[in-house]
Amino acid sequence: YTTLFRSIVAKNNERIAELEPQITEASEKLLKIKAVKLQPANPFTWASGWKSPIYNDNRKTLSYPVVRSFIKLELARVISEKFENVDAIAGVATGAIPQGALVADALNLPFVYVRSTPKDHGLENLIEGELRPGMKVVVVEDLISTGGSSLKAVEAIRRDGCEVIGMVAAYTYGFPVAEKAFKDAKVPLVTLTNYEAVMEVALRTGYIEEEDVETLNEWRKDPAHWESGK
């Protein structure tokens, strides 16, 4: 299983090979604070409706200053290296609001956040904060699963007349459906780590067992239709 994971990691990370040391470090930090949870017998239900034996709770990183700072600085570095002439940072509500604000502060850039639905009172805003038409925006997410909610935020920013030049996140599950969605939306995506890298580190360090890997492999074959114990 370890050999399999390593081959997948190598393939999936070719486009961001220069981040490989950070991929390993990010994976180790997420596992150390137990941001990755496994419940094969009592699977989680995602917002998409998918059942999953694994859940990544990146909100936990906010409670650990060392991990929080690492993610902030690495996302800021990635944005500085990968995207030019950034005018503003946008966080996707709710998980990416604090991390997005931290990244914007590190880069000394304006920050806004995008709600999933407009407020039902007051100004009824979908985007909180100020964007001006023509601004180049990088969106911050806490993690990427199917990409649906992330790309809704992109659409909202574009409707305001701004240009979304990319998205960054701490983690992605790397589903083909998400990769296709980002490609179709013409949104470059860069993440600090990914499912395969985290699982490789988890197996190597004893965080998961080989029987867990078998369950996860079955889930990965068809996550939209996977059911516990089947």
Residue ranges and their predicted role:
Residues T2-L4:
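Short, small-residue-biased leader/transition segments that mark boundaries at the very start
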Residues I16-L19:
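The feature captures the hydrophobic core positions of alpha-helical coiled-coils
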Residues Q22-E84:
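Active-site-facing substrate-recognition patch
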Residues Q22-L30, E155-K230:
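PRPP-dependent phosphoribosyltransferase catalytic core
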Residues E84-A93, V168:
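Short glycine-rich phosphate-binding loop at a beta-alpha junction
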Residues D87, M135, I165:
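Conserved acidic residues
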Residues G100-V138, T146-K152, T205:
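Short, glycine/charge-rich flexible loops or terminal/linker lids adjacent to PRPP-binding catalytic cores
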